[in-house]
Structures are given as C-alpha cells and as structure tokens.
Amino acid sequence: MARFQEFYKEKVVPGLIEKFGYKSVMEVPRITKITLNMGLGEAIADKKIIENAVGDLTKIAGQKPVVTKARKAIAGFKIRQGYPIGAMVTLRGRAMYEFLDRFVTVALPRVRDFRGVSGRAFDGRGNYNIGVKEQIIFPEIDYDKIDALRGLNISITTTAKTDDEAKALLASFKFPFRN
C-alpha cells in the first residue's frame, strides 16, 4: 500500500469525520483519480514533439499516456480532424497515491518562487485543477535531456460534494495552500 494511501486511512479519514461530522466512513470524500494533460499545439509542425512529450509524461506518471487527437478541424489553428495535439494520462489507485506523494513532497517545493498553490482553483463540485509551467520540477525528468520546457495541467477529481470539503481533504494531505 502506498504511503499516502495509508496516511489517508489512518489520519485523514478520522480528521475529516471529526471536522464535518460524517456518520459513516463511506461519506468521507476521497480522491478518485488524477489526470495529467499536456496540450501541444506546436505539435502540428513537428511530430517529434509528441514523442518527447509522451516520454516525459511516461516518466512523470509511471504509465504510458494516450495521445489526444483534434476532434474537429480549426483552420485558424491550422489543425485538421485527427491531428495529434496533446497527451493525457489518468492515474487511479496505488499509482495515483504515489504520484500525489511525489508531487506534494518533492515536485511542488522545486517550483521557482513557490509560495503555495491557489485555494481558488476548485470547480464548485470538489475537484481541483493546477497548472505546472515546467516539467523539470519532477525529479524523474533529466534537465539535460529535455528539448523544450512544457507545462501540464493536473486535475484532481474527488468525491467531495463542496469545495470546502475538497480543500479540507487536500489540506490534510499537506497540500501547501497559500490562502
């Protein structure tokens, strides 16, 4: 069992039951999945960009991402339907908890001028989104072997009904909120 998974069962669940007064442990919000998405608009010019991004995401997530394709043609962006325009990976279970552990304890402190993550990036239904500007904050990425700095979006999906419950859940995982 992953370290954060044990931490969730032993510390987070009792803390949230006490804070919100849940009657059952099944009511306690939990993280269901973490989705990493890398949009690569510049990939229309060079196909090697997709391969490098897939390699980076594979190292970061620990599993192979799926290449996302354009749903419809947009002439203004010079893309046709079916063009590869990004890469995405969904983490669940053990891999999800291990990624969250690495992200909170190792990657976030490596962000330049880091003062904490925004407490307002919730979607109203208890899910949290965070954008990372550089993939080099992850220790798995070798700085000398990257071809370009790429950002990625990290979506944390929870079973929380409100943003307050989700924020309490993530805060109990030692998420460094600034406000």
From Swiss-Prot:
Q: Which InterPro entries match?
A: Ribosomal_uL5, Ribosomal_uL5_bac-type, Ribosomal_uL5_C, Ribosomal_uL5_CS, Ribosomal_uL5_dom_sf, Ribosomal_uL5_N
Q: Show the Gene3D superfamilies listed in the entry.
A: 3.30.1440.10
Protein keywords: Ribonucleoprotein, Ribosomal protein, RNA-binding, rRNA-binding, tRNA-binding
Q: Which GO terms describe its molecular function?
A: rRNA binding; structural constituent of ribosome; tRNA binding
Q: Which GO terms describe its biological process?
A: translation
Its assembly, as annotated, is: Part of the 50S ribosomal subunit; part of the 5S rRNA/L5/L18/L25 subcomplex. Contacts the 5S rRNA and the P site tRNA. Forms a bridge to the 30S subunit in the 70S ribosome.
Similarity remark = Belongs to the universal ribosomal protein uL5 family.
Protein name stated in the entry:
Large ribosomal subunit protein uL5
